[in-house]
Amino acid sequence: MAHEAQLKFGNSKEYRVIECEYEFVQPIKDNGQPAGFPSGGLIHLVVVSPDDNDIFLHDWMQSATDQKDGQIIFTVEDKALPSPKVLRFKHAYCIRLYEYFNAHSNIQMHTKITISAAEIAFGDSGSVVFKNDQK
């Protein structure tokens, strides 16, 4: 059970993740067997907006060609548990950015982004890899 998550881009940028969703699906035949290759792999994130004038995510979103590599690290408070779960992505575009602020709530300003990656890897050292054909 993850208690914290961080979105990291190399050694330069890091954001605290509040929500993370991703999904992969396969088409199926009438009998329930797979009928094609898996698709999907969009990563939907809600991160705490930085307090400074950080425009890293905005710059990424505004570019139709800028690709980033990064990772989402899910950690637990109990250090006795195994190493954290890591989702790595490569050659990714930011295809959606939405910011939310409400002065009447105690919730910090949030940034929602959707990432479309050519490759998503899971497991120890990326032992399971999902590849999108972005030709």
Regions found by a protein language model. Name each.
Residues M1-K135:
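Glycine-rich, low-complexity intrinsically disordered segments
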